[in-house]
């Protein structure tokens, strides 16, 4: 039967509950257990799909097309389980489900209330996400004390009663701040956070105490005494140089052993050799390169979280330190392309809206004319097509209908219909809702032989995740190909262009999908590894090597 680990956070937000949960899951997986993780978000949005990246960070897309919290990206990067829409739900989804049931009469005339109807729906979602696994780690978003989190905390309190101590475990993540004026670490915020949790009816079994410096044993004993937690279950989590070292650090403090003992799990010893190799590759690069990432959300690091991590993964698998130079696309519009000088490669990521679009197009032009390795992702492919159409194919005024509906040459246009993986047809128009109406999730793409794309992946058909509603306009296909653009990947039905490249360029590749969502530190991703190899070749003054696979 599935065992449940509930992870809450206190004192302040952004303590790293997702990293802590992912790291523990990685250790348990390394001990031979089948694990999954689920994120419960207290906001009323149905999903983060329409939320600003400045507020929420990136939207992570699962294989089955769910738009989710970026923590699911951490989950997939740390464990081999593929997450889906069952692994993420929000207050908005819970209330939507309950109201739908009430309208159908499923509550038989009862007064619908937070308890039991909302809490029962939360528990149903948790159990559904955990089916078939040895251990399910459930992360509760927000901070203990927030009014929004109360229904979720009440639901997991009830689950502890239902499951008992041998099938459920509470881990509470807190902050132990250092007060420089006093020269001391302060445990009082942790004590009050646990007190707040206990007033709800939850007694944590384990505390993970975040700090920017080592926490003395005396302070851990003090925390244990005032929070009613066993002393060996007070885990100090000190800031690490890389998140991929955290599984080993938590294992050294026997966090997994405490979990195995309390839940009476049948687990072997942990084999963390893969994580040791990852950290070793990060610590001992053979070369460094600088990649310019030209976007519109670069002042908020979480907006491109998976993309930044994918470049780190490529560095791991090519023994290269990848330094990312974040460049605001509006800066290029205002001050020119000087910020791109000296970089070894240029990447333009996905995005929405007209702001900064001409800066991205200018970055593509710089990469093409200066023969700098270029990788375009989603919107990065669209601006590559626009730039090529304007400046190589001579289509003056070429644009996307997303930004200029009256463009004389709409080389990028709204997808009005497409075939899903299940074989059905999806239809969209300009009047469709913004939320949940894009081409989402894993889609197959057929690669053209003898292209850079095919050499990079080393296979004929790939599956990558999508999140877009605009596409290459096939009416301009022949014109652009005649001018030298190469279409190197299409949807299986041949109707949607998925990858383009410029054969005359040392390394110029753009894709409509988001390869960063499937990159992992242990497995890498062939597209990013090929991109970083091309950056290394430029840095070393050599020709890019023949691409092929994620491994060095």
Curated annotation (Swiss-Prot):
Residues 1-265 are annotated as: Amidoligase domain. The active site is at residues 378, 514, 516. GO terms for molecular function: ATP binding; CTP synthase activity; glutaminase activity; identical protein binding; metal ion binding. ATP binds at residues 14-19, 71. L-glutamine binds at residues 351, 379-382, 402, 469. One of its GO terms (cellular component) is cytosol. CTP binds at residues 13, 146-148, 186-191, 222. Allosterically activated by GTP, when glutamine is the substrate; GTP has no effect on the reaction when ammonia is the substrate. The allosteric effector GTP functions by stabilizing the protein conformation that binds the tetrahedral intermediate(s) formed during glutamine hydrolysis. Inhibited by the product CTP, via allosteric rather than competitive inhibition. GO terms for biological process: 'de novo' CTP biosynthetic process; pyrimidine nucleobase biosynthetic process. It catalyses: UTP + L-glutamine + ATP + H2O = CTP + L-glutamate + ADP + phosphate + 2 H(+); L-glutamine + H2O = L-glutamate + NH4(+); UTP + NH4(+) + ATP = CTP + ADP + phosphate + 2 H(+). Its EC number is 6.3.4.2. It comes from the Bacteria. Pathway: Pyrimidine metabolism; CTP biosynthesis via de novo pathway; CTP from UDP: step 2/2. UTP binds at residues 13, 186-191, 222. It is an enzyme of class 6 (ligase). Residues 290-541 form the Glutamine amidotransferase type-1 domain. Keywords: ATP-binding, Glutamine amidotransferase, Ligase, Magnesium, Metal-binding, Nucleotide-binding, Pyrimidine biosynthesis. Mg(2+) binds at residues 71, 139. Coiled coil: none annotated. CTPSs have evolved a hybrid strategy for distinguishing between UTP and CTP. The overlapping regions of the product feedback inhibitory and substrate sites recognize a common feature in both compounds, the triphosphate moiety. To differentiate isosteric substrate and product pyrimidine rings, an additional pocket far from the expected kinase/ligase catalytic site, specifically recognizes the cytosine and ribose portions of the product inhibitor. Homotetramer. Belongs to the CTP synthase family. Catalyzes the ATP-dependent amination of UTP to CTP with either L-glutamine or ammonia as the source of nitrogen. Regulates intracellular CTP levels through interactions with the four ribonucleotide triphosphates. This is CTP synthase. It comes from Methylococcus capsulatus (strain ATCC 33009 / NCIMB 11132 / Bath).
């Amino acid at each position: 039967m599935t065992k449940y680990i509930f992870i809450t956070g206190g004192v302040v937000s952004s303590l790293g509950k997702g990293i802590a949960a992912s790291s523990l899951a990685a250790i348990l997986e390394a001990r031979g257990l089948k694990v999954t993780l689920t994120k419960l978000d207290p906001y009323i949005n149905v999903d983060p799909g329409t939320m600003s990246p400045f507020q929420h960070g990136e939207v992570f897309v699962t294989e089955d097309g769910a738009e989710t919290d970026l923590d699911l990206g951490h989950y997939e990067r740390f464990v081999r389980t593929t997450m889906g829409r069952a692994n993420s739900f929000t207050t908005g989804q819970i209330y939507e489900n309950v109201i739908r049931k009430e309208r159908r009469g499923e509550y038989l005339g009862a007064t619908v209330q937070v308890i039991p109807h909302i809490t029962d729906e939360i528990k149903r979602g948790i159990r559904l996400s955990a089916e078939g696994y040895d251990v399910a780690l459930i992360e509760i978003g927000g901070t203990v004390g927030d009014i929004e989190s109360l229904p979720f905390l009440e639901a997991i309190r009830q689950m502890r009663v239902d499951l008992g101590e041998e099938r459920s475990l509470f881990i509470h993540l807190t902050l132990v701040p250092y007060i420089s004026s006093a020269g001391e670490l302060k445990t009082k915020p942790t004590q009050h956070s646990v007190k707040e949790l206990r007033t709800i009816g939850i007694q944590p079994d384990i505390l993970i105490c975040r700090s920017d410096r080592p926490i003395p044993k005396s302070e851990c004993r003090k925390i244990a005494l005032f929070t009613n937690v066993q002393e060996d279950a007070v885990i100090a989590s000190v800031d690490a140089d890389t998140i991929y070292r955290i599984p080993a650090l938590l294992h050294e403090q026997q966090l997994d052993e405490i979990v195995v003992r309390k839940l009476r799990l049948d687990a072997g010893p942990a084999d963390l050799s893969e994580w040791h190799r990852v950290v070793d590759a990060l610590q001992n690069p053979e070369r460094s390169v600088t990649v310019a990432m030209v976007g519109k959300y670069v002042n908020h690091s979480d907006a491109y979280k998976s993309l930044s991590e994918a470049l780190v993964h490529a560095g791991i698998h090519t023994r290269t330190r990848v330094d990312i130079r974040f460049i605001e696309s509006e800066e290029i519009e205002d001050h020119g392309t000087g910020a791109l000088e000296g970089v070894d490669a240029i990447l333009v990521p996905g995005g929405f809206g007209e702001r900064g679009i001409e800066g991205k197009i200018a970055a593509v032009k710089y990469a093409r004319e200066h023969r700098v390795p270029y990788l375009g992702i989603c919107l990065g492919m669209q601006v590559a097509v626009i730039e090529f159409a304007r400046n190589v194919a001579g289509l003056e005024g070429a644009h996307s209908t997303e930004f200029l509906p009256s463009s004389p040459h709409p080389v990028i246009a709204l997808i009005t219909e497409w075939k899903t993986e299940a074989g059905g047809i999806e239809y969209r128009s300009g009047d469709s809702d913004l939320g949940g109406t894009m081409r989402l999730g894993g889609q197959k793409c057929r690669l053209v032989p003898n292209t850079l794309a095919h050499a990079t992946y080393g296979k004929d058909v790939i599956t990558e995740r999508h999140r877009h509603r605009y596409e290459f306009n096939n009416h301009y296909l022949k014109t652009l190909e005649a001018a030298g653009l190469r279409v190197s990947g299409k949807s299986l039905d041949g109707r949607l262009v998925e990858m383009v490249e410029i054969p005359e360029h040392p390394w110029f590749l753009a894709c409509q999908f988001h390869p960063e969502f499937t990159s992992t530190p242990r497995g890498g991703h062939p597209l990013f590894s090929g991109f970083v190899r091309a950056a290394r070749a430029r840095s070393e003054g050599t020709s890019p090597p023949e691409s092929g696979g994620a491994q060095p």
